[in-house]
Amino acid sequence: PYDPEGARALMEEAGMADFEHELISIDDDWRRSTTDAAAAQIRDAGIPVRRTILPGSTFWNDWAKFPFSSTNWNHRPLGIQTLQLAYRSGVDWNEFGYSNPEFDALLAEASSIADADARREVMGRIQAMILEDGVTIQPYWRPLFRHYVDGFVGLDMHIAYFPNLWFWGRAA
């Protein structure tokens, strides 16, 4: 929930009320705007924040090393795949630097369960842990669309934003 006073109180309790946070984003339209909105909410709490906007050629060289940056993750066929790529201890794309042996054990358990309904219970515990540990700020899931005109077939949007070029063609 949006609680600027509570956020400020937590920073004061930690002795970091005057610490200036740097929020880094790539110079594009939606990630820049999303990070600007996050910075505004931090400022609403009276917490100092500096925005740094980098060109893609600079941002992507160090994206996983910034202490606070905005990135995006597109959908994977299984929800657990993003967790394996981005949250498991020691993996290259773990931009959060998150390391929790209990999380890793639950992730291994969930990965071993073939039945989606059985896996759902473990995934719920994993997702609660990410929330409770404050690992990431996830403001929204970005909708992806593909626009095309009549007369073509096979242009449906793939859930992972993957273009299935071999299905594209002209309608008969």
PLM segments and residue spans:
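Short hydrophobic/charged patches on amphipathic alpha-helices used for structural packing
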Residues: R8, S57-W60
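Detector for C-terminal structural segments
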Residues: D27-Q41, F59-A172
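Structural transition elements
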Residues: P1-E12, W30-S33
